[in-house]
Amino acid sequence: KAAEARGEIEYKASENVANADYERVMREYATQGNQLILGEAFAVEAAARKVAKDFPKVSFLMGSSGKPQAPNFSVFDNFIQEPSYLAGMVAGGMSKSGKIGMVGGYPIPEVNRLMNAFMAGAKEVNPKVQFSITFINSWFDPPKAKEAAFAMIDKGADLLYAERFGVSDAAKERGKLAVGNVINTQDKYPDTVVASALWHMEPSIDRALKLVKDGKFTPEDYGPYSMMKHKGSELAPLGTFEKKVPAAIVAKVKAKEADILAGKFTVKVDDGQPKS
């Protein structure tokens, strides 16, 4: 939308496309003269790559766990483990019980790496912190996520990692805290969401648009452009919790953030399934 507002592009968008319809929609966009097709191929890898092969003059930038594919298929992924680590530090400092509950959708690399980074950050602040981890095997089932979160609260968790919708609702209802993922929902949960790891796609999209415009688009892994040094991710401002998070924790988080940006500290990318 920002590129459109600047008068740089015209674009069309389709939302909630079923996996069975994905290839058809991609082909329609490719045949309509669009120069760049952007989307997610996580569950439709074979179909997406097949379309790209059939339209070699069209550029594709797709969310994928796989590698770039010649001559026109670039990939991106949610490498926002850095702000996830920082959010974990905040969580470790804010949990009074030392017990944190984590509710995820599926134990896939894109979810695992963020959970593992979050856990590592929490452990830096509180090495004795304990985690409860549940996967609900769904991308969108707020009631199920909420139920899982309630179970963790009943076992002593006073802070929840909200990888799925429904978790922050559970935290709000029980007067507990939550940490958000990918987007900032603090406006909806001002007394609940203490921190969030945000993902910004603008650096990746802007790069792809420039390369297409210059006729220089080639297969590339855009993963690094989701990292903090490229402004592809960040720890959300503490907002309503600015005066509630202890100053010592804020100082530690800011120091770690500076080290990450300076290349002095690297957050490990661990795609393995996290364990309690």
Model-predicted regions and their roles:
Residues 1-276:
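A residue-level marker of the well-folded mature domains of exported/periplasmic proteins
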